[in-house]
């Protein structure tokens, strides 16, 4: 039976459908990685993490930042910096830990990703959602597709 390490919640909704859909993909991906680890499929979990968490998150971040820039979101630079720090942390610290470390190291990295995503969606992402709503800006973009 599939388990969830992170459960999607209405509390995560930004009010921007495309971004909420992208966040749901990231949440599902972390749950898929968790289940692959529990099934002893560490190599598949690693590949999924690289393909979806690293690559898809980068596309998602770019999408968010482009929309924020287009509409003049005032906290764009801070938000962009948060994304840059996350990507750098994943590439420089988590990926080597996952590649070379034990299963516990992998699980620790996964816990970090869950915590970061939860906090990031619940705070800075909700903040931009509220800003767009206050300004009466409706985003009609489609969610970035999975490769």
Curated annotation (Swiss-Prot):
Classification via InterPro entries: Bacteriohemerythrin-like, Haemerythrin_Fe_BS, Hemerythrin, Hemerythrin-like, Hemerythrin-like_sf, Hemerythrin_metal-bd
Binding site for Fe cation 1: 23, 60, 64, 125
Residues annotated as binding Fe cation 2: 64, 79, 83, 120, 125
Keywords: Iron, Metal-binding, Oxygen transport, Transport
Annotated disulfide bonds: none
GO molecular function: iron ion binding; oxygen carrier activity
UniProt xrefs under Pfam families: Hemerythrin
Subunit structure: Monomer.
Membership in a protein family: Belongs to the hemerythrin family.
Cited function: Oxygen-binding protein. May be involved in a storage mechanism or for delivery to oxygen-requiring enzymes. The oxygen-binding site contains two iron atoms.
Protein name: Bacteriohemerythrin
Species, as recorded: Methanocaldococcus jannaschii (strain ATCC 43067 / DSM 2661 / JAL-1 / JCM 10045 / NBRC 100440) (Methanococcus jannaschii)
Organism phylogeny: Archaea, Methanobacteriati, Methanobacteriota, Methanomada group, Methanococci
């Amino acid at each position: 039976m599939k388990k969830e390490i992170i459960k999607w919640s209405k509390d995560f909704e930004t009010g921007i459908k495309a971004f909420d859909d992208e966040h749901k993909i990231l949440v599902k991906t972390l749950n898929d990685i968790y289940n692959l680890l529990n099934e002893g499929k560490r190599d598949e979990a690693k590949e999924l993490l690289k393909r979806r968490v690293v690559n898809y998150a980068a596309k998602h971040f770019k999408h968010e930042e482009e929309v924020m820039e287009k509409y003049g979101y005032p906290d764009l630079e801070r938000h962009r910096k948060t994304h840059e720090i996350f990507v750098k942390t994943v590439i420089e610290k988590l990926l080597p830990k996952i590649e070379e470390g034990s299963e516990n190291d992998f699980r620790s990295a996964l816990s970090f990703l869950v915590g970061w995503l939860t906090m990031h969606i619940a705070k800075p992402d909700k903040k931009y959602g509220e800003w767009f709503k206050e300004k009466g800006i409706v985003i009609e973009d489609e969610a970035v597709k999975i490769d």
